[in-house]
């Protein structure tokens, strides 16, 4: 069986799809990946990858869309626009590579197309070549809502996206509520990389891992300055992953590191502080560590509020990060207990390898 996996040309959209793609391959199926941009700059486990969006520049697309919709842009930057802006944003993005995905599907003749909710070019391709399409969640919004928003956008309105043969849901029900579909565990995948020896085990003191988004953009605020200012009064070691280029002199309990596979680092951390991307949230939950999520544009406020509502972490604006907040993050037993409960909930969900047989049965 040949499977085509399609994502928007962004690393954070592609990486969550890799574990299922690898499970397909390990089960003896042929897997092709269609994406672009920085999504193809990371280790995809040896999967055959096709660049369907050469020269893709998300920043330029976002700038044009937000300029056309200034009132919605203001709500989007505050994380209050729901799916209104994301539909136009990713509709415009998909329009730049949908023809290439369709051409690839016609040439390679997959038996099934798996696509993420904001990579609906995959759904168009499945419809055009007459094979089942499967939507795989890679964030905390309902997949159907996102697909509908992108499909209804001006740039994608002329393309028909058929109803998916199945929807794979990865959000733990205690976080977002139960959802119809085929449940699957969100298995973190960071795209390879080396882990320094000092991060391969727990330290003598609590450890806070701090990471930044792989997508540059306005809004939300960078918490780095507040973290560095608070650090001397925090009884923990703080690790800044891929920090901004210029930093002041760091306190003794703050270290920096380049890109590391967070799925191999977080299990030894006490807490995780990040920008609120869905991959970061699900990775932190899978590791069972409390999170401090900085609300921001797009889905980041939604994600931060979901984590805080579940009790598995805190939602704190960048400029409101203080020693008291960081000390609570590593000492509040209720946060740690809730984070472990969600970890156990996710661990009980079916693995990607468990859902492959059910998806294989969809072949026409």
Range-by-range predicted roles:
Residues 1-123, 129-131, 232, 239, ...:
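Glycosyltransferase specificity loop/lid
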Residues 5, 135-137, 209-212:
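Short beta-strands and strand-loop turn motifs
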Residues 22, 185-271, 281:
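Donor-nucleotide binding loops and adjacent catalytic segments primarily
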Residues 34-40, 145, 150-218, 241-246:
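A nucleotide-sugar donor-handling region in carbohydrate enzymes
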Residues 51, 135, 167-170, 183-185, ...:
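Structural signal for conserved beta-strand scaffold positions within catalytic alpha/beta enzyme cores
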Residues 77-84, 140-154, 306:
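Acceptor-binding helix/loop patch of EC 2.4 sugar-transfer enzymes
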Residues 128-142:
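Active-site proximal beta-strand in glycosyltransferases
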Residues 132-136, 181-187, 225-226, 289-292:
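A short, gly/pro- and small-residue-rich
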């Amino acid at each position: 069986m040949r499977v085509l996996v399609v994502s928007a040309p962004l690393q954070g959209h592609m990486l969550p799809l890799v574990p299922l793609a690898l499970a397909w391959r390990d089960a003896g199926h042929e897997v092709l990946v269609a994406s672009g941009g920085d999504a193809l700059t990371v280790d995809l486990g040896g999967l055959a990858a096709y660049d369907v969006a050469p020269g893709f520049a998300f920043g330029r697309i976002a700038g044009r869309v937000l300029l056309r919709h200034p009132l919605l842009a203001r709500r989007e930057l505050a994380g209050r626009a729901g799916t209104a802006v994301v539909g136009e944003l990713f509709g415009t993005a998909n329009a730049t590579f949908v023809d290439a995905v369709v051409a690839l599907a016609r040439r390679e003749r997959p038996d099934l197309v798996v696509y993420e909710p904001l990579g609906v070019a995959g759904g168009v391709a499945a419809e055009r070549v007459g094979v089942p399409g499967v939507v795989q969640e890679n964030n905390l919004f309902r997949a159907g809502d996102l697909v509908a928003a992108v499909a209804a956008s001006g740039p994608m309105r002329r393309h028909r996206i058929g109803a998916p043969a199945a929807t794979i849901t990865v959000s733990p029900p205690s976080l977002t509520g139960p959802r119809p579909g085929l449940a699957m565990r969100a298995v973190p995948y960071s795209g390879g990389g080396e882990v320094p020896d000092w991060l391969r085990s727990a330290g003598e003191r609590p450890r806070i891992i701090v990471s930044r988004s792989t997508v540059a953009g306005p809004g939300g605020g960078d918490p780095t300055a507040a973290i560095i200012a608070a650090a001397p009064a925090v009884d923990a070691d703080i690790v800044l992953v891929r920090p901004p280029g210029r930093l002041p002199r760091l306190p003794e309990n703050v270290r920096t590191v380049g890109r590391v596979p967070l799925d191999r680092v977080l299990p030894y951390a006490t807490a995780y502080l990040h920008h609120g991307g869905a991959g970061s949230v699900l990775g932190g939950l899978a590791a069972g560590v409390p999170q401090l999520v900085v609300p921001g544009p797009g889905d980041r406020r939604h994600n931060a509020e979901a984590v805080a509502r579940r009790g598995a972490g805190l939602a704190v604006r960048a400029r409101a990060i203080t020693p008291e907040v960081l000390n609570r993050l590593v000492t509040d037993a209720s946060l740690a207990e809730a984070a472990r409960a969600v970890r156990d909930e996710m661990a009980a969900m079916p693995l990607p390898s468990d859902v492959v047989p059910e998806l294989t049965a969809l072949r026409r």
